[in-house]
Amino acid sequence: MTTAATAAAIVTAGSVRFGNDLPLAVIAGPCQLESRGHALEVASALKEIATRLNIGLVYKTSFDKANRTSGSAARGLGLAQSLPIFAEIRSSLGLPVLTDIHDASQCAEVAQAVDVLQIPAFLCRQTDLLLAAAATGKVVNVKKGQFLAPWDMANVVAKITGAGNPNVLATERGVSFGYNTLISDMRSLPIMARTTGAPVIFDATHSVQQPGGQGTSSGGQREFVPVLARAAVAVGVAGVFIETHPDPDHAPSDGPNMVPLAEFEGLLRRLMAFDKLAKAPATDTR
């Protein structure tokens, strides 16, 4: 096994640079890939926003929501239909693309069509999956499990860097707090940055999720997305992860968490202002 000493302090996905001391970047898009037309519509809108605001943006969407609450819930278009759409978004819009992988056997094929492979929170300790993702050489974004302490992510990241891939992002998405509830401990952000050495991302939309809270699906408290996002950016992070949709209330998954696309630009403007303040040089007022 090849060993990389540490995670890269700056990770590049396409033209987007992530670093805890760099200007804020964003990972955004709908929860799942619903259709080619829908994906291109949202990706085009997000690119326009990112261009206006001069912020690096990675487009995210999922070809398979493999951990839905109910077995009858919609899961996405699947691998075969999704990969050409990912490739089209990259080639026609010039946006880097992120998607989840769920099994080691998927990594090499998916890596041909995307820039970032994402490890779902529930799978963050699955060594074979982490090693297969690392072997592609792509950026690997690991969601911290809802069951992990922030310092435990050091072992997760080390599995990837130890396989010779230093290009790792570590994402905070809340921790279980009783039944159907997640909370966000903002101390975890600097702890993860210090213990992993990786750029840290805050997932502002899954952090307000209420897992299984609607019986056969998860609920969420979308109104708290801006609150938690502002707090995380004020602490200081490399990027924010925000799921957005033109009509969240009719989305096939995670609708209660997602930010309406019409509100996305305003939210991002405010977060960029917080980021500028958080990363400004300290002023000696003595």
From Swiss-Prot:
Reactions it catalyzes: D-arabinose 5-phosphate + phosphoenolpyruvate + H2O = 3-deoxy-alpha-D-manno-2-octulosonate-8-phosphate + phosphate
Keywords: Cytoplasm, Lipopolysaccharide biosynthesis, Transferase
GO MF, one example: 3-deoxy-8-phosphooctulonate synthase activity
Pfam family, one: DAHP_synth_1
Catalytic EC class: transferase
Family: Belongs to the KdsA family.
Name assigned to this protein: 2-dehydro-3-deoxyphosphooctonate aldolase
Native source organism of the sequence: Bradyrhizobium sp. (strain BTAi1 / ATCC BAA-1182)
